[in-house]
Amino acid sequence: MTRPRSFFALMMAFMMAFLVSCSSVEAKVPTTYTAAQIQQIQRYAPTLTEFRSRMDNLGTLIQNRNWIDTVTYIHGPLGDLRGTMRAVSGTLLPQSQQKAVDLTKSLFGDLVEIDNAAKANDYAKVTASYQTAVNHFENFLQLIPKA
């Protein structure tokens, strides 16, 4: 009788050790940026500022109804904007990341609408999409922590 009881106690001890070793403590989500994270994000700041000024140049092309240059400008000087925004999104805090990704997708949806409307010479649609794109980009820039 002692043998099964000892065996049962040994099995319970192994099972408890296994369960404790497999359990995990819930990881805390960081609520503030570390100095290294801010430094990494700030490396993108000049590039994002340049892209913001390029958005103003796009507005000038739209205002002048220069459709060919508008389409070319979207695919040329603004071509790297998506990659930069995605890289920045990945470095933000988790609570800001999803919003940044959504704003990036929205901005590029707006640029596609501008592209299509410019090809169709639809000034009203181009200007509406441009204003929405600028708003999305400004909202994205608000997510970037200040140094």
Regions inferred by a protein language model and the residue ranges of each:
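C-terminal motif of bacterial Sec signal peptides marking the signal peptidase cleavage site
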Residues: 18-21
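A structural signal for well-ordered alpha-helices, especially hydrophobic packing surfaces
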Residues: 52-62, 82-89, 111-118, 137-144
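Short, charged, amphipathic alpha-helical segments
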Residues: 71-76, 97-105, 124-134
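Short, solvent-exposed, charged loop/turn and helix-capping segments
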Residues: 81-101
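C-terminal partner/receptor-binding element of secreted or periplasmic proteins
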Residues: 121, 127-147
